[in-house]
Protein backbone atom coordinates (compact mmCIF):
# COMPACT_ATOMS: atom_id res chain seq x y z
CA UNK A 1 0.00 0.00 0.00
CA UNK A 2 1.27 3.45 -0.89
CA UNK A 3 2.28 5.58 2.08
CA UNK A 4 0.26 8.79 2.56
CA UNK A 5 1.26 11.05 5.43
CA UNK A 6 -0.81 14.14 4.60
CA UNK A 7 -4.46 14.81 3.73
CA UNK A 8 -7.19 17.44 3.86
CA UNK A 9 -10.77 16.66 4.85
CA UNK A 10 -14.03 18.41 5.70
CA UNK A 11 -16.08 17.39 8.75
CA UNK A 12 -19.66 18.57 9.26
CA UNK A 13 -21.56 17.94 12.48
CA UNK A 14 -25.31 17.38 12.33
CA UNK A 15 -27.79 20.23 12.78
CA UNK A 16 -30.12 20.12 15.75
CA UNK A 17 -33.76 19.23 15.10
CA UNK A 18 -36.42 21.96 15.22
CA UNK A 19 -38.76 22.40 18.16
CA UNK A 20 -42.47 21.67 17.62
CA UNK A 21 -45.40 24.10 18.00
CA UNK A 22 -48.34 21.79 18.77
CA UNK A 23 -51.28 21.76 21.18
CA UNK A 24 -52.92 19.08 23.24
CA UNK A 25 -56.09 17.85 21.54
CA UNK A 26 -58.19 15.32 23.46
CA UNK A 27 -61.84 14.61 23.98
CA UNK A 28 -63.45 16.78 26.66
CA UNK A 29 -60.30 18.95 26.84
CA UNK A 30 -61.05 21.88 24.53
CA UNK A 31 -58.08 23.96 25.60
CA UNK A 32 -55.31 21.50 26.33
CA UNK A 33 -52.45 23.98 26.03
CA UNK A 34 -49.09 23.66 24.27
CA UNK A 35 -47.31 20.30 24.15
CA UNK A 36 -44.61 20.75 21.48
CA UNK A 37 -41.40 18.82 22.21
CA UNK A 38 -37.77 19.80 21.67
CA UNK A 39 -35.71 18.83 18.66
CA UNK A 40 -32.94 16.24 18.99
CA UNK A 41 -29.28 17.23 19.08
CA UNK A 42 -27.17 16.85 15.97
CA UNK A 43 -24.52 14.16 15.75
CA UNK A 44 -20.90 15.12 16.49
CA UNK A 45 -17.69 14.08 14.73
CA UNK A 46 -14.88 12.49 16.75
CA UNK A 47 -11.33 11.39 15.97
CA UNK A 48 -9.68 8.38 17.61
CA UNK A 49 -6.09 7.11 17.37
CA UNK A 50 -5.86 3.55 16.05
CA UNK A 51 -2.58 1.63 16.24
CA UNK A 52 -3.77 -0.75 13.50
CA UNK A 53 -3.49 2.01 10.89
CA UNK A 54 -0.24 3.33 9.45
CA UNK A 55 -1.26 5.63 6.60
CA UNK A 56 -3.81 8.34 5.76
CA UNK A 57 -4.66 6.76 2.40
CA UNK A 58 -8.37 6.43 3.31
CA UNK A 59 -8.65 10.21 3.60
CA UNK A 60 -7.09 10.90 0.20
CA UNK A 61 -10.15 9.54 -1.63
CA UNK A 62 -13.06 10.30 0.69
CA UNK A 63 -12.68 13.84 1.96
CA UNK A 64 -16.06 14.86 3.38
CA UNK A 65 -17.67 13.39 6.49
CA UNK A 66 -21.10 14.45 7.76
CA UNK A 67 -22.84 13.41 10.98
CA UNK A 68 -26.58 12.80 11.21
CA UNK A 69 -29.10 15.59 11.79
CA UNK A 70 -31.29 15.51 14.88
CA UNK A 71 -34.99 14.76 14.39
CA UNK A 72 -37.64 17.44 14.91
CA UNK A 73 -39.69 17.51 18.10
CA UNK A 74 -43.23 16.11 18.13
CA UNK A 75 -46.54 16.58 19.88
CA UNK A 76 -47.30 15.28 23.36
CA UNK A 77 -43.95 16.68 24.53
CA UNK A 78 -42.04 14.13 22.44
CA UNK A 79 -38.37 14.96 21.99
CA UNK A 80 -36.72 14.35 18.62
CA UNK A 81 -34.16 11.57 18.35
CA UNK A 82 -30.54 12.72 18.51
CA UNK A 83 -28.35 12.31 15.43
CA UNK A 84 -25.78 9.50 15.37
CA UNK A 85 -22.19 10.52 16.09
CA UNK A 86 -19.45 9.42 13.69
CA UNK A 87 -15.93 8.41 14.68
CA UNK A 88 -13.00 8.73 12.29
CA UNK A 89 -9.98 6.46 12.88
CA UNK A 90 -6.48 7.81 12.31
CA UNK A 91 -2.99 6.31 12.72
CA UNK A 92 -1.26 6.97 16.01
CA UNK A 93 0.92 10.04 15.50
CA UNK A 94 -1.58 12.03 13.42
CA UNK A 95 -1.60 15.77 14.06
CA UNK A 96 -4.91 17.50 13.24
CA UNK A 97 -5.14 21.25 12.68
CA UNK A 98 -7.73 23.70 11.37
CA UNK A 99 -6.98 24.34 7.70
CA UNK A 100 -8.47 27.85 7.70
CA UNK A 101 -6.95 29.26 10.89
CA UNK A 102 -3.93 26.97 11.32
CA UNK A 103 -5.00 26.33 14.93
CA UNK A 104 -3.85 22.92 16.25
CA UNK A 105 -6.78 20.76 17.30
CA UNK A 106 -5.32 17.44 18.41
CA UNK A 107 -2.19 15.33 18.53
CA UNK A 108 -3.23 11.67 18.47
CA UNK A 109 -0.05 10.40 20.10
CA UNK A 110 -1.60 7.59 22.19
CA UNK A 111 -3.59 4.60 20.96
CA UNK A 112 -7.28 5.04 21.76
CA UNK A 113 -7.07 8.79 22.33
CA UNK A 114 -10.43 10.36 21.42
CA UNK A 115 -10.93 14.00 20.44
CA UNK A 116 -13.99 16.04 19.41
CA UNK A 117 -13.58 17.52 15.92
CA UNK A 118 -17.01 19.09 15.30
CA UNK A 119 -19.81 19.63 17.82
CA UNK A 120 -23.38 18.78 16.84
CA UNK A 121 -25.99 21.54 17.04
CA UNK A 122 -28.41 21.80 19.96
CA UNK A 123 -32.04 20.95 19.33
CA UNK A 124 -34.64 23.72 19.12
CA UNK A 125 -37.19 24.35 21.88
CA UNK A 126 -40.85 23.38 21.55
CA UNK A 127 -43.67 25.81 22.35
CA UNK A 128 -44.16 24.09 25.71
CA UNK A 129 -41.21 26.16 26.99
CA UNK A 130 -42.89 29.48 26.15
CA UNK A 131 -46.11 29.03 28.11
CA UNK A 132 -46.65 31.75 30.71
CA UNK A 133 -49.37 33.31 32.82
CA UNK A 134 -50.06 35.92 30.13
CA UNK A 135 -49.60 33.65 27.08
CA UNK A 136 -51.36 30.35 27.66
CA UNK A 137 -51.23 29.25 24.01
CA UNK A 138 -47.82 30.25 22.59
CA UNK A 139 -47.06 29.43 18.98
CA UNK A 140 -43.40 30.28 19.38
CA UNK A 141 -40.73 27.63 18.90
CA UNK A 142 -37.02 27.73 18.00
CA UNK A 143 -35.08 26.15 15.17
CA UNK A 144 -32.25 23.70 15.76
CA UNK A 145 -28.70 25.05 15.95
CA UNK A 146 -26.40 24.40 13.01
CA UNK A 147 -23.63 21.87 13.56
CA UNK A 148 -19.98 22.87 13.32
CA UNK A 149 -18.29 22.69 9.93
CA UNK A 150 -14.49 22.53 9.76
CA UNK A 151 -11.81 22.06 7.13
CA UNK A 152 -8.97 20.02 8.61
CA UNK A 153 -5.36 19.34 7.73
CA UNK A 154 -4.06 15.89 8.68
CA UNK A 155 -0.35 15.28 9.09
CA UNK A 156 1.08 11.92 10.12
CA UNK A 157 4.30 11.92 12.12
CA UNK A 158 5.37 8.36 12.74
CA UNK A 159 6.19 7.41 16.32
CA UNK A 160 9.76 6.13 16.33
CA UNK A 161 12.49 6.16 18.97
CA UNK A 162 15.42 6.36 16.55
CA UNK A 163 15.61 8.16 13.22
CA UNK A 164 18.02 7.41 10.37
CA UNK A 165 19.30 10.19 8.15
CA UNK A 166 21.98 10.51 5.55
CA UNK A 167 22.69 10.98 1.88
CA UNK A 168 21.09 8.62 -0.67
CA UNK A 169 22.91 5.29 -0.81
CA UNK A 170 24.46 5.74 2.65
CA UNK A 171 23.20 2.28 3.65
CA UNK A 172 20.22 3.25 5.83
CA UNK A 173 17.88 0.61 4.44
CA UNK A 174 20.59 -2.04 4.65
CA UNK A 175 21.15 -1.10 8.29
CA UNK A 176 17.46 -1.33 9.22
CA UNK A 177 17.30 -4.75 7.51
CA UNK A 178 20.33 -5.87 9.51
CA UNK A 179 18.97 -4.92 12.95
CA UNK A 180 15.21 -5.54 12.57
CA UNK A 181 12.66 -7.67 10.73
CA UNK A 182 11.82 -4.79 8.36
CA UNK A 183 12.53 -5.52 4.72
CA UNK A 184 12.76 -2.24 2.81
CA UNK A 185 13.94 -2.27 -0.78
CA UNK A 186 17.71 -1.93 -1.21
CA UNK A 187 19.76 -1.25 -4.30
CA UNK A 188 23.04 0.15 -5.55
CA UNK A 189 21.46 3.35 -6.87
CA UNK A 190 20.30 6.58 -5.17
CA UNK A 191 16.75 7.04 -3.84
CA UNK A 192 15.98 3.35 -3.53
CA UNK A 193 13.86 4.31 -0.51
CA UNK A 194 10.87 6.39 -1.59
CA UNK A 195 8.82 6.35 1.62
CA UNK A 196 9.47 5.95 5.36
CA UNK A 197 10.05 2.46 6.74
CA UNK A 198 9.72 1.39 10.36
CA UNK A 199 11.50 -1.50 12.05
CA UNK A 200 11.27 -2.88 15.58
CA UNK A 201 14.64 -3.71 17.13
CA UNK A 202 14.54 -6.23 20.00
CA UNK A 203 17.54 -6.48 22.29
CA UNK A 204 15.84 -9.04 24.56
CA UNK A 205 12.33 -10.28 25.37
CA UNK A 206 11.34 -7.16 27.31
CA UNK A 207 13.41 -4.44 25.66
CA UNK A 208 12.89 -3.00 22.21
CA UNK A 209 12.71 0.23 20.25
CA UNK A 210 11.38 1.47 16.91
CA UNK A 211 13.69 2.80 14.22
CA UNK A 212 12.56 4.94 11.25
CA UNK A 213 14.26 5.09 7.86
CA UNK A 214 13.36 7.99 5.56
CA UNK A 215 14.45 8.71 1.97
CA UNK A 216 17.94 10.12 1.67
CA UNK A 217 18.61 13.84 1.95
CA UNK A 218 20.56 15.91 -0.51
CA UNK A 219 21.95 19.41 -0.35
CA UNK A 220 19.10 21.91 -0.62
CA UNK A 221 16.53 19.52 0.89
CA UNK A 222 15.25 22.21 3.28
CA UNK A 223 14.27 24.26 0.21
CA UNK A 224 12.53 21.29 -1.41
CA UNK A 225 15.29 19.48 -3.32
CA UNK A 226 15.08 15.69 -3.45
CA UNK A 227 12.60 13.57 -1.50
CA UNK A 228 13.81 13.58 2.09
CA UNK A 229 12.50 17.01 3.04
CA UNK A 230 8.93 15.68 2.64
CA UNK A 231 9.56 13.14 5.38
CA UNK A 232 11.76 15.00 7.86
CA UNK A 233 8.67 15.55 10.01
CA UNK A 234 8.79 11.84 10.85
CA UNK A 235 12.04 12.39 12.75
CA UNK A 236 10.60 15.09 15.01
CA UNK A 237 9.26 12.64 17.62
CA UNK A 238 12.45 10.58 17.84
CA UNK A 239 14.77 10.61 20.85
CA UNK A 240 18.03 10.24 18.94
CA UNK A 241 19.19 10.50 15.32
CA UNK A 242 21.67 8.18 13.61
CA UNK A 243 23.57 10.01 10.89
CA UNK A 244 24.88 7.35 8.50
CA UNK A 245 27.85 8.25 6.32
CA UNK A 246 29.22 6.24 3.39
CA UNK A 247 32.90 6.13 4.26
CA UNK A 248 33.85 4.34 1.02
CA UNK A 249 31.97 6.00 -1.87
CA UNK A 250 32.44 4.54 -5.35
CA UNK A 251 32.76 8.00 -6.89
CA UNK A 252 36.23 9.37 -6.05
CA UNK A 253 34.93 12.92 -6.40
CA UNK A 254 32.46 12.45 -3.54
CA UNK A 255 33.70 13.94 -0.27
CA UNK A 256 32.08 12.14 2.71
CA UNK A 257 32.95 15.00 5.08
CA UNK A 258 31.36 17.64 2.87
CA UNK A 259 28.24 15.49 2.38
CA UNK A 260 27.93 14.84 6.13
CA UNK A 261 28.24 18.54 6.98
CA UNK A 262 25.67 19.35 4.27
CA UNK A 263 23.16 17.01 5.95
CA UNK A 264 23.72 18.73 9.30
CA UNK A 265 23.16 22.13 7.68
CA UNK A 266 19.91 20.93 6.07
CA UNK A 267 18.68 19.82 9.50
CA UNK A 268 19.45 23.23 10.95
CA UNK A 269 17.60 24.99 8.13
CA UNK A 270 14.56 22.73 8.38
CA UNK A 271 13.97 22.73 12.15
CA UNK A 272 16.17 24.02 14.96
CA UNK A 273 14.69 21.54 17.45
CA UNK A 274 15.49 18.65 15.10
CA UNK A 275 19.02 19.99 14.68
CA UNK A 276 19.46 20.08 18.48
CA UNK A 277 18.39 16.45 19.03
CA UNK A 278 21.07 13.98 20.15
CA UNK A 279 22.81 12.90 16.95
CA UNK A 280 25.23 9.99 16.68
CA UNK A 281 27.58 9.59 13.76
CA UNK A 282 27.63 6.13 12.15
CA UNK A 283 30.46 5.49 9.68
CA UNK A 284 29.21 2.75 7.36
CA UNK A 285 30.59 0.44 4.63
CA UNK A 286 33.86 -0.34 6.39
CA UNK A 287 33.78 -3.71 4.61
CA UNK A 288 34.72 -1.89 1.40
CA UNK A 289 37.98 -0.67 2.95
CA UNK A 290 41.13 -2.67 3.43
CA UNK A 291 41.66 -3.51 7.12
CA UNK A 292 44.84 -1.44 7.29
CA UNK A 293 43.05 1.58 5.73
CA UNK A 294 40.10 1.71 8.14
CA UNK A 295 41.70 3.41 11.14
CA UNK A 296 43.46 6.15 9.11
CA UNK A 297 40.28 6.81 7.07
CA UNK A 298 38.14 7.10 10.23
CA UNK A 299 40.69 9.34 11.97
CA UNK A 300 40.95 11.63 8.94
CA UNK A 301 37.17 11.88 8.67
CA UNK A 302 36.66 12.73 12.36
CA UNK A 303 39.41 15.33 12.28
CA UNK A 304 37.87 17.08 9.26
CA UNK A 305 34.27 16.71 10.48
CA UNK A 306 34.82 18.18 13.93
CA UNK A 307 33.43 17.34 17.36
CA UNK A 308 30.80 14.60 17.56
CA UNK A 309 28.65 13.43 20.48
CA UNK A 310 29.28 9.73 19.77
CA UNK A 311 30.47 7.82 16.73
CA UNK A 312 30.31 4.17 15.66
CA UNK A 313 32.04 2.25 12.90
CA UNK A 314 29.96 -0.45 11.20
CA UNK A 315 29.35 -2.52 8.11
CA UNK A 316 25.57 -2.78 7.77
CA UNK A 317 25.88 -5.34 4.97
CA UNK A 318 27.94 -7.78 7.06
CA UNK A 319 26.46 -6.79 10.44
CA UNK A 320 29.85 -5.75 11.78
CA UNK A 321 29.54 -3.31 14.70
CA UNK A 322 25.71 -3.29 14.56
CA UNK A 323 25.19 -5.24 17.78
CA UNK A 324 27.21 -2.80 19.87
CA UNK A 325 25.35 0.11 18.29
CA UNK A 326 21.85 -1.20 18.99
CA UNK A 327 22.70 -2.05 22.61
CA UNK A 328 24.13 1.45 23.08
CA UNK A 329 20.89 2.82 21.63
CA UNK A 330 18.80 0.64 23.94
CA UNK A 331 20.69 1.84 27.02
CA UNK A 332 20.32 5.46 25.91
CA UNK A 333 16.59 5.06 25.26
CA UNK A 334 16.03 3.29 28.59
CA UNK A 335 17.65 6.26 30.32
CA UNK A 336 15.56 8.72 28.27
CA UNK A 337 12.34 6.87 29.09
CA UNK A 338 13.22 6.77 32.78
CA UNK A 339 13.82 10.53 32.73
CA UNK A 340 10.52 11.12 30.94
CA UNK A 341 8.64 8.95 33.45
CA UNK A 342 10.36 10.71 36.36
CA UNK A 343 9.44 14.13 34.96
CA UNK A 344 5.86 12.99 34.39
CA UNK A 345 5.67 11.61 37.94
CA UNK A 346 7.05 14.89 39.29
CA UNK A 347 4.45 16.87 37.31
CA UNK A 348 1.67 14.60 38.56
CA UNK A 349 2.91 14.94 42.16
CA UNK A 350 3.07 18.72 41.78
CA UNK A 351 -0.45 18.75 40.36
CA UNK A 352 -1.69 16.60 43.26
CA UNK A 353 -0.06 18.98 45.74
CA UNK A 354 -1.64 21.95 43.98
CA UNK A 355 -5.07 20.33 44.06
CA UNK A 356 -4.61 19.35 47.72
CA UNK A 357 -3.58 22.90 48.61
CA UNK A 358 -6.55 24.29 46.72
CA UNK A 359 -8.87 21.84 48.47
CA UNK A 360 -7.34 22.73 51.84
CA UNK A 361 -7.77 26.44 51.16
CA UNK A 362 -11.33 25.85 50.02
CA UNK A 363 -12.09 23.79 53.13
CA UNK A 364 -10.55 26.48 55.35
CA UNK A 365 -12.63 29.15 53.62
CA UNK A 366 -15.77 27.05 54.00
CA UNK A 367 -14.98 26.43 57.68
CA UNK A 368 -14.39 30.15 58.22
CA UNK A 369 -17.64 30.99 56.45
CA UNK A 370 -19.49 28.39 58.52
CA UNK A 371 -17.98 29.79 61.72
CA UNK A 372 -19.03 33.29 60.69
CA UNK A 373 -22.56 32.05 59.95
CA UNK A 374 -22.74 30.32 63.33
CA UNK A 375 -21.51 33.45 65.08
CA UNK A 376 -24.09 35.53 63.20
CA UNK A 377 -26.81 33.04 64.13
CA UNK A 378 -25.71 33.18 67.77
CA UNK A 379 -25.87 36.99 67.75
CA UNK A 380 -29.30 36.83 66.17
CA UNK A 381 -30.47 34.37 68.82
CA UNK A 382 -29.10 36.61 71.58
CA UNK A 383 -30.90 39.59 70.07
CA UNK A 384 -34.13 37.61 69.89
CA UNK A 385 -33.69 36.51 73.50
CA UNK A 386 -33.15 40.10 74.62
CA UNK A 387 -36.24 41.21 72.69
CA UNK A 388 -38.24 38.42 74.30
CA UNK A 389 -37.07 39.45 77.79
CA UNK A 390 -37.95 43.06 77.07
CA UNK A 391 -41.43 42.06 75.90
CA UNK A 392 -41.90 39.90 79.01
CA UNK A 393 -40.88 42.84 81.21
CA UNK A 394 -43.39 45.12 79.48
CA UNK A 395 -46.11 42.50 79.86
CA UNK A 396 -45.33 42.16 83.59
CA UNK A 397 -45.55 45.95 84.07
CA UNK A 398 -48.86 46.04 82.26
CA UNK A 399 -50.23 43.19 84.35
CA UNK A 400 -49.14 44.96 87.56
CA UNK A 401 -50.93 48.16 86.63
CA UNK A 402 -54.15 46.29 85.83
CA UNK A 403 -54.02 44.48 89.21
CA UNK A 404 -53.60 47.71 91.34
CA UNK A 405 -55.98 50.46 90.13
CA UNK A 406 -55.12 52.75 93.13
CA UNK A 407 -51.52 52.86 92.02
CA UNK A 408 -52.42 55.77 89.68
UniProtKB/Swiss-Prot annotation:
InterPro entries: G_OBG (IPR031167), GTP-bd (IPR006073), GTP-bd_Obg/CgtA (IPR014100), GTP1-OBG_CS (IPR006074), GTP1_OBG_dom (IPR006169), GTP1_OBG_dom_sf (IPR036726), OBG_GTPase (IPR045086), P-loop_NTPase (IPR027417). CDD domains: Obg. Gene3D superfamilies: GTP1/OBG domain (2.70.210.12), P-loop containing nucleotide triphosphate hydrolases (3.40.50.300). It holds the Pfam family MMR_HSR1. Residues 160-334 form the OBG-type G domain. Its cofactor is Mg(2+). It comes from the Bacteria. One of its GO terms (cellular component) is cytoplasm. The keyword Iron does not apply. The keyword Acetylation does not apply. Residues 385-408 are annotated as: Disordered. It is an enzyme of class 3 (hydrolase). GTP binds at residues 166-173, 191-195, 213-216, 284-287, 315-317. One of its GO terms (molecular function) is GTP binding. Mg(2+) binds at residues 173, 193. It is found in: Cytoplasm. GO terms for biological process: ribosome biogenesis. Its EC number is 3.6.5.-. Keywords: Cytoplasm, GTP-binding, Hydrolase, Magnesium, Metal-binding, Nucleotide-binding. PANTHER family: DEVELOPMENTALLY REGULATED GTP-BINDING PROTEIN-RELATED, MITOCHONDRIAL RIBOSOME-ASSOCIATED GTPASE 2. Belongs to the TRAFAC class OBG-HflX-like GTPase superfamily. OBG GTPase family. HAMAP family: GTPase_Obg. Monomer. An essential GTPase which binds GTP, GDP and possibly (p)ppGpp with moderate affinity, with high nucleotide exchange rates and a fairly low GTP hydrolysis rate. Plays a role in control of the cell cycle, stress response, ribosome biogenesis and in those bacteria that undergo differentiation, in morphogenesis control. This is GTPase Obg. It comes from Azoarcus sp. (strain BH72). The gene is obg.
